Structure formats: structure tokens, C-alpha cells
Amino acid sequence: MSKQLDLYDIQGNICKGYGRYGYPKARYCFLRFDDPKQGRLFLLDLIKDITTAEAWEAKEDSPNKPPCTTNIGFTYSGLEALAIPQRSLKGFPVDFTAGMKARSHILGDTGCNSPENWDEIWHGGRVHAWLSIYARDSNMLESRF
């Protein structure tokens, strides 16, 4: 027996390769939340722009195709910085809570790709979230950013 997925609760970048849907422009932002309340307020404002996995056609003139897509991913330290309750944080699998550095040998990040060679931004849990914006053209990308 299979379950029906609630596509509204799944971010679009999980199910769609935006490049093949006509979004050749992209910008990636790394975020840090220094104040939990301000971070949560930022996310409350951002949520209206998050692209879900709900169906839309790839055709350029599709009426429900968004002009831009926006998605976000969090690190464990990012969820901690947002003051997510410990009870909730404990529910995440160790693969996520350990982080990429602790799992580098499993991920193939060895030799020149090992954690000690990563850019400084990746040291010490400083990245709390990754924001991706895809657009049909540069003007649309700049207007969303």
C-alpha cells in the first residue's frame, strides 16, 4: 500500500530539477541566525515565497508556473540557533545531527576534499541555512533576491 504525498508540504527542489523547467539563473545564499527571534521572523516572512512540489507544467506560458523558485535547507546548528526545542531536535537522525564534517569519510570528502580543506565558512557551525533562488532570467533573479 502506498501513501499519497502532500506535495504542498514538500519543497519543490526535492522533486524538480529547476534547470530543466526553464530556470537557468540561480543564486545561493548561506545564512546565519544570530538572534533566534529575528531568525524566526525572517522565516515567517520568507515562507510565502517558498516553492512547493505542487505540480506545474514546464511550458513557458503555464499559468501556475512561478516566475522564480525559492527553497531553503537548514543545518542542525541552524535549528539550534533558531531555538528549536531540544525535544524536537532529538527527533532528527544522527546522520543529520552529526553534520557533514563528522560524516566526511562516508560522503567521500577525503584528500583535497577533506574538511580541513573546506572554505572557512564551513568551520565551526557558522552556516545555519542555505537559500536557493532560481529564475527564468537575471532580472527576475534580482527582483526576488
Give the positions of each predicted feature.
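Long, low-complexity, Ser/Thr/Gly/Pro-rich intrinsically disordered segments that act as flexible linkers
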Residues: 1-145
